[in-house]
Amino acid sequence: MINPIAFKLGPLSLHWYAVCILVGLLLAVYLAAKEAPRKKMTSDDIIDFILIAFPLAIIGARIYYVAFEWSYYSQHLSDIFAIWNGGIAIYGGLITGTIVLFVYCYYKVLNPIHFLDIAAPSVMLAQAIGRWGNFFNQEAYGRAVSQLNYLPSFIRQQMFIDGSYRVPTFLYESMWNLIGFVIIMVWRRKPRSLLDGDIISFYLIWYGCGRLVIEGMRTDSLMLLGIRVSQYVSVLLIIIAIVFIFKRHRQKGISYYQE
């Protein structure tokens, strides 16, 4: 088993979970800042937004998780703040971040669809990297299996939990997000085929479909009325994206890159 603590500095400990999130964040900011000028924004617009949105998104992700696990946290109130042990719900962070984005764009007089298109591939890459935080914490896994011989030994060893090998759903989602990121980056090189909102719509459909399937493999999902919460959200986001694409193309929306 890999030590979840990357290193210690006196009484302070830096967990691999945090390292994965921070690496994903830095790469996401770099990619978004690089793309911003092509959408008539500045890198400062991106950085200022991140400084506001990131801490709020972490808080939102934690609140989302705690809310659906309140039966546990109501009896262990001190654990609510122990985010280094895991328990950050991605959808909670995305919902919070999106709300902050619309408020930020309103006050900065920026186009929120432009901002979402810029953010989508960056977020997808950050999610691909961030999922490895679940690997180090031994969470977000699936049912017990007899062997995982198709995986490298370090993953097999880390996925040996409670006396059994576990389906590495974190890895499936990480790879799914990475593939989606590559598709967007290639697609973005052909702007004539793109309209404003196509990138964020693709993200919602791609991530939503992947999460819908992979979530069904997990054994530690947040539940609501006997169904996994993330599956509810995934279906909703897929429907929203499909409706948005249909309306946008029917109305012959604005091209992704404007001269």
UniProtKB/Swiss-Prot annotation:
Main location: membrane
EC nos: 2.5.1.145
Gene Ontology BP annotations: lipoprotein biosynthetic process
Entries under InterPro entries matching the protein: Lgt
Organism superkingdom: Bacteria
Keyword Cell membrane belongs to the record: yes
Pathway where it operates: Protein modification; lipoprotein biosynthesis (diacylglyceryl transfer)
Entry GO CC: plasma membrane
Positions bound to a 1,2-diacyl-sn-glycero-3-phospho-(1'-sn-glycerol): 131
Transmembrane segments: 12-32, 46-66, 83-103, 109-129, 167-187, 194-214, 226-246
Compartments where found: Cell membrane
Top enzyme category: transferase
Family: Belongs to the Lgt family.
Functional summary from the UniProt entry: Catalyzes the transfer of the diacylglyceryl group from phosphatidylglycerol to the sulfhydryl group of the N-terminal cysteine of a prolipoprotein, the first step in the formation of mature lipoproteins.
Stated name of the protein: Phosphatidylglycerol--prolipoprotein diacylglyceryl transferase
Source organism of the structure: Streptococcus equi subsp. zooepidemicus (strain H70)
